[in-house]
């Protein structure tokens, strides 16, 4: 195809100290859908990842198990690869940060930075475990928060009041490793001169390489002042030694992102690809990182600064996503919702999760809720009842009455053209990572396809001998519409698409969507997808509970997060109690956004044109800071107070109030509803 693009796509590196869970899978599914879509469009895409295999937790866990760190990370890598393959994640290479490629690139980049005067040294004071004879990283110290006096808090931040501090400030600290009271020791550490890159980073922040929410967060960091970054750790430590030093190692977060380069270098060495073409400073290729919101700090500040300092190219874009919650709350081991990928795979088709995540994913940094009841309902409703049923209800007639041969012309050319015409819109949604919009549009088409079959009623036509040609045309048309739909869904449901290709006897490509299957044989129809049963979910939950109930309860230091939504927030107190009669006075309605635009003269207001089913309303809402691209709200459902008296404002009439949650300003989130809601529905 013309304008063929060359891309390198990465996912954040899973830590080699634990199993893959459904939180990890959100990112890898999101990236894989995007990669598969780009490949369908004819672009050249390389998709790589690796295990993040260094750090104190791995060293200690290996010692606890009586094995070497190398043995521990080898097993983790094999397990991770097996899980990703089972979920149909189409990596071209999956490597490890504990590799010769990573050692060589990390060492070379460090020496470049050092020789440019970008590595500084100074003596710092640290907590030291006198029993284990080791310096203690922040998360290996616990004590009482110096700000709010909450007990049992980690050495870098308080999960009660959200304060950050030095582990030296903890009250009554103790070592998570041994329980001993740490002492203070001094050590020379090595620092990357991040402030030297502030001007470059400010320019890069506004270059379009970051989501607006990340750019806003970076502005806060700039205002707070950039600090030199400690890139060293003291022995004992599992990682790469720093050249020309004794008992000093690179901090895991220095060599972890370099793992992207190392994994690609490994692929290049095996396949003959040109490594420099993708990483040289003036590269014409594209580089994309899919990451979680908790590691934005490292990827948006340290990583581009390191690349700039080493005369390497910077990412084309960084795509961050939120966390996974289950039934509205944080994943829980005790409730059985901290589900490992391997547990899920024993009981449920991986494509069920791929579809559900896709149906909810958008380009914003929002947490995604895996509602287990909705999961079952949506998979069965969309994939089984709508999509697969469309094929099966027509295929039986084609096989039995027409020897598997499709008609030689389209029964409804206008309907075919309507389906094909949506290819560009669906492609735009995939490109923008607005998978929820793509799925919504595809399912709208699926409803139209099933309505076509319902209206034509081939089961009635089949009973009339003189309508054989009509039966052939109608059922062939139904199969043709199914072909278009499954083509659109191929990036999301690759295994279902493969089974559909075997049935249709053709390859599903983006460039042949507009080419109908005329006078072509299809294979005898076989079941394409099985219904998802609630009992399968129940088995996953129970097995997860059992898995963690048998594991010893030991303290596991957590990876620090710079954008941690799981910390307890400053929640506003509950308002004064009201009666049910008071609540009944509110008429809350579902509304669909017809058009949303900024009010140019206002710093706060967006103007909404809303569909309430039987009429339209205009509402002015002060959420401009939270939604910098108001046009992206078009088509969304919102909840509004419909019986609020109209209010004449400076910028126009506001006929109601749209509901949102948050503390105000940029921290506001529109409320919406579940699948199936329609404009005008009353909220009860």
From Swiss-Prot:
Its main location: cytoplasm. It holds the Pfam family tRNA-synt_1g. Its cofactor is Zn(2+). GO terms for cellular component: cytosol. Its EC number is 6.1.1.10. Residues 582-684 form the tRNA-binding domain. A motif ('KMSKS' region) lies at residues 330-334. It is found in: Cytoplasm. The keyword RNA-binding applies. Is required not only for elongation of protein synthesis but also for the initiation of all mRNA translation through initiator tRNA(fMet) aminoacylation. Homodimer. This is Methionine--tRNA ligase. It comes from Haemophilus ducreyi (strain 35000HP / ATCC 700724). The gene is metG.
């Amino acid at each position: 195809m013309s304008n063929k693009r060359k891309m390198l796509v990465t996912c954040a590196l899973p830590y080699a100290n634990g199993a893959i869970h459904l939180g990890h899978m959100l990112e890898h599914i999101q990236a894989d859908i995007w990669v598969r879509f780009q490949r369908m469009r004819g672009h050249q895409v390389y998709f790589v990842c690796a295990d993040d295999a260094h750090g104190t937790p791995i060293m200690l866990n290996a010692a606890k198990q009586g094995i070497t760190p190398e043995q521990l990370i080898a097993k983790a890598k094999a397990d991770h690869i097996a899980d990703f393959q089972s979920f149909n994640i189409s990596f071209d290479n999956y490597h490890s940060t504990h590799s010769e490629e990573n050692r060589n690139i990390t060492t070379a980049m460090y020496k470049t930075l050092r020789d440019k005067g970008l590595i500084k040294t100074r003596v710092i004071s640290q907590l030291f475990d006198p029993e284990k004879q080791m310096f203690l990283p922040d998360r290996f110290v616990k004590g009482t928060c110096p700000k709010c006096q909450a007990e049992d808090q980690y050495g870098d931040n308080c999960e009660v009041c959200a304060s950050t501090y030095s582990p030296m400030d903890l009250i009554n600290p103790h070592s998570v490793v041994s329980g001993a009271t740490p002492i203070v020791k001094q050590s020379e550490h090595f620092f990357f001169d991040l402030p030297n890159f502030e001007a470059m980073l400010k320019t890069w922040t506004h270059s379009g390489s970051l989501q607006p929410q990340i750019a806003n967060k970076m502005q806060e960091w700039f205002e707070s002042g950039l600090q030199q970054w400690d890139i060293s750790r003291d022995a004992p430590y599992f990682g790469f030694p720093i050249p020309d030093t004794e008992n000093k190692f690179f901090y895991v977060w220095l060599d972890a992102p370099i793992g992207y380069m190392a994994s690609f270098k490994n692929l290049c060495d095996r396949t003959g690809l040109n490594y420099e073409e993708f990483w040289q400073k003036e590269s014409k290729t594209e580089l994309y990182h899919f990451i979680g919101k908790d590691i934005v700090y490292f990827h948006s500040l340290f990583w581009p600064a390191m690349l700039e300092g080493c005369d390497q190219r910077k990412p084309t874009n960084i795509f961050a996503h939120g966390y996974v919650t289950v039934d509205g709350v944080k994943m829980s081991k005790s409730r059985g919702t901290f589900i490992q990928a391997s547990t899920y795979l024993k009981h449920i088709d991986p494509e069920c999760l791929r579809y559900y995540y896709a149906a909810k994913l958008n380009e914003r940094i929002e947490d995604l809720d895996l509602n287990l009841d909705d999961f079952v309902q949506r998979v069965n409703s969309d994939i089984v009842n709508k999509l697969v049923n469309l094929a099966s209800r027509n295929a039986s007639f084609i096989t039995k009455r027409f020897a598997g041969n499709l008609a030689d012309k389209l029964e409804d050319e206008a309907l075919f053209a309507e389906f094909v015409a949506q290819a560009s819109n669906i492609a735009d949604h995939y490109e923008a990572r607005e998978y929820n919009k793509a799925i919504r549009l595809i399912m709208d088409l699926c409803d139209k396809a099933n309505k076509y079959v319902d209206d034509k009623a081939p089961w009635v036509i089949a009973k009339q001998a003189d309508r054989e040609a009509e039966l052939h045309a109608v059922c062939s048309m139904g199969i043709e519409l199914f072909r278009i739909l499954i083509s659109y869904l191929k990036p999301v449901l690759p295994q279902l698409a493969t089974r559909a290709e075997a049935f249709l006897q053709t390859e599903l490509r983006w460039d042949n969507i507009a080419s109908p299957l005329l006078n072509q044989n299809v294979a005898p129809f076989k079941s394409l997808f099985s219904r998802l049963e609630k009992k399968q979910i129940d088995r996953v939950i129970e097995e997860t509970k059992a898995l963690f109930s048998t594991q010893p309860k030991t303290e596991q230091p957590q990876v620090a997060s710079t954008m941690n939504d799981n910390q307890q927030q400053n929640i506003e107190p509950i308002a004064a109690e009201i009666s049910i009669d008071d609540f009944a006075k509110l008429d809350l309605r579902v509304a669909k956004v017809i058009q949303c635009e900024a009010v140019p003269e206002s710093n706060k207001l967006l103007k909404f044109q809303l569909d309430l089913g039987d009429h339209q309303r205009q509402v002015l809402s002060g959420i401009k800071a939270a939604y910098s691209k108001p046009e992206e709200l078009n088509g969304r459902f919102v909840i509004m107070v419909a019986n609020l008296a109209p209010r004449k404002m400076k910028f126009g009439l506001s006929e109601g109030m749209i509901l949102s949650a948050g503390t105000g300003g940029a921290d506001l989130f529109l409320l919406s509803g579940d699948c199936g809601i329609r404009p005008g529905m009353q909220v009860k």
